Amino acid sequence: MWRRPPGVAPGTWQYVHQRPIADHYDAFVEDAAVCRIDAEILTKVLPGVSNSAEQPEMVLDLGCGTGRTALPLASRGYDVIGIDLSEPMLGVLVGKVLTQKQQNQTEPTQQPSDACAFGQIYPIKANLVDLGGIADGAADHAVCLFATMGMIQGRSNRRTVMQHVARIVRPGGKLVIHVHNRWAALAESGGYRSLTRSWLRSITSKDHDFGDATYAYRGLSEMFMHRFSRRELVTDLSACGWQVDEVMRLAIEADRFLGKFRNGGGVAGGFIVVATRK
């Protein structure tokens, strides 16, 4: 009997098969403040690879979508393994890669000898919970942005993803991850009630974790998202082979960072975490 892949909620299964969502994804996220913020962080953490490097560095892009992160990384000289469960999304990415290759061939640019060459992008259709086909130590770094980790249903499944990534990334490599904050619900209408319901349900149902929610999203009535507490995220990463270096608190609008928790600054809408493979 057919079953959905592990960690994939019903709404997520619908999402990854919607071609219109993939076709209009770039326009949808174009003005998303968090995309600008995470791009700035990536530029600092993964600034680029020069041609003088002995070999290219490989970045694992988890939930790569249409290449919003993969293409800028490749432009800085990184090779990228782009993993997504959505075939329509990967189709858009492949089209962009082919266009970029044609541009590189027909419009060569004069660059310094130590400037980075455009890296290779390797799209793979896969469930993030099931990455056993990727070899140990295949990547130097990894990114998991735009709340992709929260789209995975079940804490054990999310930990499985983190463990896979720790296995694939070489020791000393970096992970940059973005998630939504569970307690941001307190700033929303009815948020206290929804958090209470989620907590009670997490006690009575083995299929529900505190912070799980479904919501209407781009024509889908039950899109799944798990929202993390800071403690939960740090605990899970630490238990799965990662040393947490920095936890950055995003404003509710995701357009700026807040101060440290003890220094005030309001409730965070989400977190961007930088971690190192132990």
Q: Where would I find each of the regions flagged by the language model?
A:
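Conserved class I S-adenosyl-L-methionine
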Residues: 1-54, 68, 268
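Class I SAM-dependent methyltransferase "Motif I" SAM/SAH-binding loop
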Residues: 63-65
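Class I SAM-dependent methyltransferase SAM/SAH-binding core
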Residues: 67-101, 114-130
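A short acidic, Gly/Pro-enriched loop at the edge of an enzyme's catalytic core
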Residues: 133-142
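A short SAM/SAH-binding and catalytic strip from SAM-dependent methyltransferases
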Residues: 141-156
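A short glycine-rich, Lys/Arg-flanked "PGG" loop and its adjoining helix->strand segment in the class I
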Residues: 159-171
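SAM-dependent methyltransferase
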Residues: 176-237, 246-254
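Core SAM-dependent methyltransferase catalytic element
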Residues: 259-278
